[in-house]
């Protein structure tokens, strides 16, 4: 199994907690490789994370993406969000071609069950599996041309990278971001929803529980 994160040095404690939660609940049938897109993670913190993952008999690979904005090819206004949020759109750019499926997790997520449950989901021919986000209002849906469509949360993604590459999803997403620079509330999440709306497999809400969802109860 391949798990992907995009984090900077400030998010290392949260990433460590996430990795611990993944392996603590994993059945162990399949090996896990943790792929970390690193934007400035120090050598000391990389070493500590590597030692921790090795103790769990799993694998960890770092990718230096400190120059990831060069791959974007344009300047982008994230409206106050950390610029690294856009890096997940470049997953096919940085990950090896032999990786055909990947789970993306926000670094501050905690996994409470076996991650294999998500890994083995049937995407039904879609490019990406995402969990619906119930807190988005009509005005934002209209702005993204999503009337009549579900809006989805990008904190957890199950991606068919083979299809992502063959259908040029990255180019489409980056083109959309460039055209909407500074006018997307949730940046990459909005882009994923707007561009891939017909290619998203809606996953069960049990696979992603957010504080926003808790507040709505």
For each predicted feature, which ranges?
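Catalytic core of tubulin tyrosine ligase-like
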Residues: 164-183, 201-203
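Conserved donor-nucleotide/metal-binding helix-loop-beta segment in metal-dependent transferases, i.e.
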Residues: 113-138
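Single conserved hydrophobic/aromatic residue that forms the stacking wall/gate
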Residues: 209-217
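N-proximal low-complexity "stem/linker" segments adjacent to membrane-targeting elements
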Residues: 1-7, 13
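Acidic donor-binding segment of Leloir-type glycosyltransferases
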Residues: 33, 38-63
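Active-site-proximal specificity loops/subdomain of glycosyltransferases
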Residues: 56-90
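Histidine-anchored nucleotide/phosphate-binding helix
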Residues: 12-26
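Short aromatic/hydrophobic "clamp" motif used to bind/position activated sugar donors
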Residues: 102
């Amino acid at each position: 199994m391949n798990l992907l994160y995009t984090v900077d040095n400030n998010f290392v404690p949260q990433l460590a907690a996430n990795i611990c939660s993944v392996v603590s609940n994993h059945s162990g049938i399949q090996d896990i490789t943790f792929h970390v897109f690193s934007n400035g993670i120090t050598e000391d913190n990389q070493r500590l994370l590597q030692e921790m993952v090795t103790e769990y008999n799993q694998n960890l690979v770092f990718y230096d993406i400190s120059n990831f904005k060069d791959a974007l090819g344009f300047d982008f206004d994230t409206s106050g969000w950390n610029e690294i949020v856009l890096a997940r759109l470049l997953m096919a750019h940085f990950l090896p071609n032999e990786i055909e499926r990947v789970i993306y997790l926000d670094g501050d997520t905690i996994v409470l069950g076996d991650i294999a449950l998500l890994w083995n989901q049937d995407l039904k021919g879609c490019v990406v599996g995402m969990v619906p986000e119930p807190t988005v209002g009509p005005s934002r849906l209209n702005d993204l041309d999503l009337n009549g469509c579900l809006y989805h949360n990008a904190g957890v993604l199950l991606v068919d990278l083979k299809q992502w590459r063959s259908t040029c999803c990255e180019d489409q997403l980056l083109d959309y971001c460039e055209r909407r620079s500074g006018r997307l509330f949730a940046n990459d999440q909005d882009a994923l929803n707007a561009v891939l709306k017909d290619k998203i497999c809606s996953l069960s809400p049990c696979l992603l529980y957010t504080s926003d969802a808790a507040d709505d109860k």
